[in-house]
Design a protein with these regions (language model features):
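Extended alpha-helical targeting/anchoring segments
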Residues: 2-479
């Protein structure tokens, strides 16, 4: 049902969803096969998975179909679309983005089924590096490459959210209805259980190219070190962009990537004329109830394939002065960012090794309690972009990145994920990720520079991070 409420003498529509639920056995299906069954019938569908099954939270995969409301920001306009197709357009230069997102989120409510402990509804989407002008007092000067241009931000509410509980081999279909809409749960169940699904091939259609040569990247590292020497910044994270043309179905690249580089955040978001997908090791920010959490990642070494050797490398990593100094700065930055709207900020774990397919990272955990009456999206603005993708002090690092990188970041180092109507927030940083647009795959990687960084080692770090993506491109051709 759909009710009109008066709030502060201004008319605001409050949309309350009537949610229908159906539970199915999921022991013969996978999120990938279900997504393949649904994506041609429901364009603009999303898939979120996790291969980090250490906790019950990460045992759930989600598929979202049929957007029914959304908020979208580009260079000039903010567009709000409500159920029933009512659209409101505002001048992007005259808005307070944090408040707009909060107001839009507050336009919806649903009755969550607490005992299921699943995401049944909310806003799913992303925001790009371009949003930084709405979070920080900074003006980006690098022009956006039209080939990489996508909306700065978009979140949607979906009619169908499918949750797959891998731990219990159960699947839930949540259908969100307004007014007197008829349920189509039967049809959705039929589509999910249909034995057939279409598959297509993927082919590379040319060589990889980059916005910078190896030597230019080494020179950029030297230039950043000069700024550190002068005291402009303590640490900075320049990056390098790559692109490769292709033909066919890029979903095969996602399938290859999730197999080669399992990670806590696997995602495939299809927006029709472009797609965002990746296998990110790093959370941008998590908010659950009153607690906000950042997981700074810094310290990267290539894996050997031998667990005993890898553990020795992890110990060495913790003792490496360059890696530890970088990590200390990022933990301090996370504490400072959270302190703006949180109390009781503390470091809960420090420099613990985490193992991924090609590399080992050192990870810490910093938490804070939201102050009373705080808009959770304020915390998002405070903590974006992650220090691990910018540097410290953050404002100066961002200014230098804008001046020297030569390529507007667009999706790279943006954030992607889920935001609850209640303000809960769980987003990954868009690293180890692809933007697919007009038959070209764009991808990017960087590394943290401190005073004693070695340009050759920094070049190698970028290659280590890109390795899994390049390997996925090769494997995708064989699927």
């Amino acid at each position: 049902m759909h009710s009109l409420q008066q709030e502060d003498k201004t008319q605001k529509m409050k949309y309350t969803f009537k949610t229908q639920t159906r539970k199915l056995l999921a022991d013969t299906t996978t999120p990938v096969s279900i997504y393949l069954r649904l994506r041609d019938i429901f364009p603009n569908s999303l898939l979120l998975e996790s291969s980090d099954y250490h906790s019950r939270d990460n045992n759930i995969s989600y598929i979202c179909c049929q957007p029914i409301a959304g908020i979208q920001l580009d260079e000039k306009e903010l567009t709000l679309t409500y159920p029933g197709k009512e659209r409101i357009v505002k001048n992007a230069h005259e808005i307070e983005l944090r408040q707009e997102v909060s107001d839009f989120r507050n336009s919806f409510e649903d009755h969550t089924i607490a005992e299921l402990n699943l995401i049944s509804n909310g806003l799913f989407g992303y925001f790009t590096f371009d949003c930084i002008e709405h979070f920080e007092d900074i003006k980006l000067t690098t022009t956006v490459d039209p080939a990489r241009k996508i909306p700065f931000m978009q979140y949607h509410v979906y009619k169908y959210v499918i949750a797959i509980d891998h731990f219990r081999n159960q699947l839930y279909i949540f259908e969100h209805l307004l007014d007197d809409e008829e349920s189509e749960l039967e049809r959705m169940q039929f589509l999910i259980q249909n034995k057939n699904f279409p598959e297509y091939t993927f082919k590379l259609a040319g060589e990889e190219s980059s916005n910078r040569t190896d030597e230019e990247h080494r020179q950029l590292v030297k230039k950043m070190k000069e700024h550190i020497q002068r005291g402009d910044v303590f640490q900075i994270v320049p990056s390098r962009g790559f692109k490769t043309p292709f033909s066919g179905d890029e979903f095969n690249v996602y399938r290859a990537l999730r197999s080669i580089n399992p990670s806590p955040y696997l995602f495939y978001f299809d927006y029709g004329d472009f797609k965002l997908f990746g296998s990110s090791p790093e959370a941008q920010l998590r908010i659950h109830g009153k607690q906000a959490t950042i997981f700074p990642i810094a310290g990267t070494f290539k894996r050997t394939g031998n667990m005993e050797e890898d553990q020795k490398i992890a110990t060495k990593l913790k003792e490496d002065p360059k890696e530890t100094s970088e990590h200390v700065m990022l933990v301090d930055l996370a504490r400072n960012d959270l302190s703006r709207h949180c109390t009781q900020v503390k470091v809960e774990s420090y420099m613990e090794p985490q193992y991924y397919s090609h590399i080992i990272h050192l990870v810490s955990k910093v938490t804070g309690t939201l102050k009373d009456n705080i808009n959770p999206f304020d915390i998002v603005g405070d903590t974006y972009p992650a220090g691990t993708l910018s540097g410290a002090p953050k404002h100066m690092a961002l200014t230098l990145i804008d001046r020297y990188e030569g390529l507007q970041r667009s999706f790279y180092s943006g954030a992607i994920g889920f935001m609850g109507f209640n303000g809960d927030f769980n987003h990954a940083i868009m690293i180890r990720s692809f933007l697919s647009k007009q038959n070209t795959l764009h991808y990017q990687a960087g590394g943290g520079i401190v005073l004693d960084s070695d340009p050759e080692m920094e070049l190698q770090e970028v290659n280590n991070k890109i390795a899994a993506l390049r390997k996925a491109l090769q494997l995708a051709e064989t699927l």
